[in-house]
């Protein structure tokens, strides 16, 4: 067996997994969490995990669906986000060779309310962080640990956590 104090010390030294319910910008007036959730099941689990934490404010969910992948999941993910979140922003997530707007239209088929649509992911992150009220949580889903956005066959540098951290700094400075 392992001594309990040794096991506890080892557990305390563990680092969180990048892009999996990753908190961004500790100490700010809103919570921002980045997660790789890119399937219906993963999105629902991420939303439910975030909702289980102590948070009195609204839950914002920002997500998109990848292009050239299973189009059948898009409306289902829209349904899940719109059912469980207080505010939803639908955006791009590696559209690859597809039109970002066409992917978003597929997602919107699953929404029975009116989510915010912003195809530019950087602008969507900026919008969510700017519009969130004190105590709100913003869940940025779909890319997690990825450091690129694939558009038209080109991988462009893009990191959800870095973009969110930049916007949080701007929010705190204002």
Where are the regions a protein language model picked out?
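ATP-dependent carboxylate-amine ligase
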Residues: 1-174
């Amino acid at each position: 067996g392992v001594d309990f104090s040794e096991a506890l010390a080892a557990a305390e030294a563990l680092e969180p997994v990048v892009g999996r319910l990753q908190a961004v910008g500790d100490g700010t007036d809103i919570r921002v969490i980045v997660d790789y959730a890119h399937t219906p099941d993963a999105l629902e689990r991420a939303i439910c995990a975030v909702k289980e934490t102590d948070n009195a404010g609204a839950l914002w969910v920002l997500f998109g669906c990848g292009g050239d992948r299973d189009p059948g999941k898009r409306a289902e993910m829209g349904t899940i986000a719109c059912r469980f979140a207080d505010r939803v922003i639908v955006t791009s997530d590696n559209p690859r060779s597809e039109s970002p707007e066409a992917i978003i239209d597929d997602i919107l088929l699953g929404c029975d309310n009116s989510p915010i649509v912003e195809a530019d992911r950087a602008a969507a992150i900026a919008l969510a962080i700017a519009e969130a009220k004190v105590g709100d949580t913003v869940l940025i889903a779909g890319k997690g640990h990825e450091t690129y956005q694939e558009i038209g066959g080109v991988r462009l540098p893009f990191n959800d956590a870095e973009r969110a951290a930049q916007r949080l700094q701007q929010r705190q400075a204002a």
